[in-house]
Amino acid sequence: FDQAVMRKPNRSYRRYQQIAELVNTAVREKADMLVMPEACTPKEWLPTLARTCEKNHLAVVTGVEHIIEDNCVYNLTAVILPYEEKWTGQWHSVILYHSKNHFAPEEKRMIESLYLRAMEGIESSEAECDAKYELYSWNGFWFTVYCCFELTSIRDRSIFQSYIDALIAVEWNQDVN
């Protein structure tokens, strides 16, 4: 987190190997879905990950390393879903994004201490936006994705009550790592 927000992201081969090993283990174990932590995967590596997903019919939910653009910090979660094109039989994958609706207070303080702005949800103006969450269906499995501090909102957690098979949470906290 610190390196990414200070514009010094880690793109080392060692880091790439660690993520590749996670994905390759999921493929070897014939997993249907792999869930990785918040801020885990650099955005530049998502297309490569998506190609692996389509070749192996593996769904992936991963936190995207914080993105900084125009002094705004975005915390995204990527949902990569492989699918078969019915008329050709070819496999493809789609990358969908969830923008974190609620930053943790300490995360927000750290970002603002660097004179950056934490972009919560899908903000189209300076006004606060309503929290937005996506409902996914993949192979008959209905799920939604929440990113870390979003889970603290009882109201937000209840949005998909009786609609989903699972609420997938990506997080990166010292107390759970």
Regions found by a protein language model. Give the residues of each.
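N-terminal, active-site-proximal structural segment of metallo-dependent hydrolase catalytic domains
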Residues: F1-M33, C40
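Amphipathic coiled-coil/heptad-repeat helices and related helical stalk/stem segments
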Residues: R15-I19, W45, C129, T152-S153
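Short, surface-exposed connector motifs at secondary-structure boundaries
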Residues: R28-L34, S137-W142, S162-L167
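Long, hydrophobic, well-ordered secondary-structure blocks that form the structural core
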Residues: P42-K43, T52-K55, V60-W87, Y97
